[in-house]
């Protein structure tokens, strides 16, 4: 996935 670091982080942790 190619997105901003913040968005990528949120998507990766997606609680």
From Swiss-Prot:
Keywords from the UniProt entry: Disulfide bond, Neurotoxin, Presynaptic neurotoxin, Secreted, Toxin
Main location per the UniProt record: secreted
The organism's place on the tree of life at top rank: Eukaryota
Gene Ontology terms for molecular function: toxin activity
Positions of the BPTI/Kunitz inhibitor domain: 1-15
Entry comment describing in which tissues the protein is expressed: Expressed by the venom gland.
A GO CC term assigned to this protein in UniProt: extracellular region
UniProt-annotated location(s): Secreted
Oligomer and partners: Heterodimer; disulfide-linked. The A chains have phospholipase A2 activity and the B chains show homology with the basic protease inhibitors.
Family listed: Belongs to the venom Kunitz-type family.
Role summary: Neurotoxin T1-1 is a presynaptic neurotoxin of the venom that exhibits indirect hemolytic activity against human erythrocytes. The B chain is homologous to venom basic protease inhibitors but has no protease inhibitor activity and is non-toxic.
The protein, known as: Kunitz-type serine protease inhibitor homolog T1-1 B chain
The organism of origin for this protein: Bungarus candidus
Taxonomy of the source species: Eukaryota, Metazoa, Chordata, Craniata, Vertebrata
């Amino acid at each position: 996935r190619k997105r901003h670091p913040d968005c990528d982080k949120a998507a990766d942790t997606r609680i």
